[in-house]
Amino acid sequence: LSFNLHRNVVFKNADVPGQPLGYMEYSKPENLWKGLDKYCNEDTNCESLTIPHNSNMSGDMMFRRDKFNVQRTDFTPDYVQLRNKYEPLLELYQHKGGSECQRGGKNGADEFCEFEKFPFNNLIADRFNGFLTGEPGEQSFLRYALAEGLNQENIHGTNPFKYGVVGSTDTHLGTPGLVDEVEYLGHGGAGADNGGGSEVATGLTDLISF
């Protein structure tokens, strides 16, 4: 159902692995971190971190481990240390909605939980008018992760969700400062959403799931 679980991988310098760590070989988050441990380390003068985004559209899977293995293995000391090492940041806001807290969650009314909420829990839903989706659950949001991180620290001695937060546009234009709403070029640069009646450029898309 196209749950959003991918990460941005950011390298400190130009010393990077010889080839990308692709999904076919590293389909689970912890396998990505293990691959970085193997190919991007002190011996290769390489350093990196991963930044997950759109946890609100992860189908309650972003902060779980048992969903990614047949054995339903939960958190272990090695896992929480690995995640703590490679994932110090979380993207909290972008144009696919806020990932801080669930709308109408168990803690009651909170204006921050009503702001910029995307009504789907996966990336494919907007193409089918909400079909194949539901409201994002509590486990898709940062506040859940922060509390669960403290719980795991009590158990394993390390907090896997000790996050700083970032906000971004999530456009695919390579222009992080291009945030003018009047001249908005759209998510993919086609300009379909700028209200000016301009034609959509061939080969570009402005689907929110792009």
Residue ranges of model-derived segments:
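Extended, charged catalytic domains and RNA/DNA-binding interfaces, predominantly
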Residues: 1-210
